[in-house]
Amino acid sequence: MCDKEFMWALKNGDLDEVKDYVAKGEDVNRTLEGGRKPLHYAADCGQLEILEFLLLKGADINAPDKHHITPLLSAVYEGHVSCVKLLLSKGADKTVKGPDGLTAFEATDNQAIKALLQ
């Protein structure tokens, strides 16, 4: 399967396309081109429905990418409040530190996200 097409669907919120990839055997925990997992791309781009679907299909909520960034940190860095809320509600580890040595709470100035992380 073509990573670029799958990554495009993840980033752009094409849930039907993502479902098709998974139905055809795409591993929701496979490291894609770029050293990231599907959950990272969805979290980075604020794709809440994609996040929910991938988690339902067994995506590892705390999987680090090649930079040791978790999906929660990805959502925090990009300011996606709804994604942060979902990931926390599903058990994301908020104590993990990013490559800068900061936790998600320490890495954001977004007050809504800080409130969720407290």
Curated annotation (Swiss-Prot):
ANK repeats lie at residues 2-30, 34-66, 67-99. Pfam families: Ank_2 (PF12796). Induction: Up-regulated in heart left ventricle of patients with severe coronary artery disease and history of myocardial ischemia. Up-regulated in heart left ventricle of patients with dilated cardiomyopathy. The modification N-acetylcysteine is found at residue 2. Belongs to the myotrophin family. This protein is produced by a bicistronic gene which also produces the MPD6 protein from a non-overlapping reading frame. MPD6 belongs to a group of cryptic antigens without conventional genomic structure. It is encoded by a cryptic open reading frame located in the 3'-untranslated region of MTPN. Interacts with RELA. Interacts with the heterodimer formed by CAPZA1 and CAPZB. This is Myotrophin. The gene is MTPN.
